[in-house]
């Protein structure tokens, strides 16, 4: 008698608990956007020698400025669309000691006119 209860209870418990993972994709998840949305158009406006104020006007406030490295700004954008894989885009902007733009790196290509005079 005790054995029959286990034969019924065990598959029932496994089926109910396993059903949670099968229904998870059906649960609605909101889209989550975090950080600085960076467009290639804005990156194309950056020029060698721009001041920090000019870069901030074009790109907006950086997501991160490390206290030990104030001449390196990080623009980070992270987007999660429901159950799909997350997307992350990074742009790192470097300034010299005078606060002028010297280099940039990340997921956005530098424009051909980056080294042209302002």
UniProtKB/Swiss-Prot annotation:
User: Is Isomerase one of the keywords?
Assistant: no
- Kindly state which keywords UniProt assigns to this record, in alphabetical order: Cell outer membrane, Lipoprotein, Membrane, Palmitate, Signal
Lipid moiety-binding residues (N-palmitoyl cysteine): 20
Secretion signal span: 1-19
Q: InterPro entries from the xrefs? A: BamE, BamE-like, BamE_dom
Q: How does the UniProt record describe the way this protein sits in the membrane?
A: Lipid-anchor
Q: Could you tell me which residues are lipidated, with the kind given as S-diacylglycerol cysteine?
A: 20
Q: Name one GO cellular component term.
A: Bam protein complex
Molecular function (Gene Ontology), one example: protein-macromolecule adaptor activity
* Functional summary from the UniProt entry: Part of the outer membrane protein assembly complex, which is involved in assembly and insertion of beta-barrel proteins into the outer membrane.
What protein am I looking at?
Outer membrane protein assembly factor BamE
Q: Which organism is it from?
A: Aliivibrio fischeri (strain ATCC 700601 / ES114)
Cite the source lineage: Bacteria, Pseudomonadati, Pseudomonadota, Gammaproteobacteria, Vibrionales
